[in-house]
């Protein structure tokens, strides 16, 4: 759907939806929709950047979701993914991370993206400052292995 059509959406019916999943990476989104999407699940391609129109659509979806609807977000396990999560959580306070745990870092570290000492030091400082509390276990594992995990790593499992 072209983003210009968002301005014309006035109502969203989510009565049959029990889970909303936002996925940052297009390839992972496509694969997830084809192989894992559940009947009562709405899967939304996030795309990494929240334009004003995309923010408007996400806010509408969030307002229409039932209180019991599980809403989750999946992105790279790195600073960019943590930032995207925080921005989306500003719109959806009940948002939870999906496949962004320390366990996932351990599972996929052999395919991880090696990071510089500067990157790792900055990430450690962010963790110590409490910047990404939901990702403390993931950050600890990133620091241990010295790598971050791109979503594409999950396609090779």
Residue positions per predicted region:
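Nucleic-acid enzyme cleavage-core boundary/entry regions
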Residues: 1-45, 50-64, 68, 80, ...
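Structural alpha-beta junctions
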Residues: 91-97
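Active-site donor/metal-binding and catalytic loop motifs
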Residues: 100
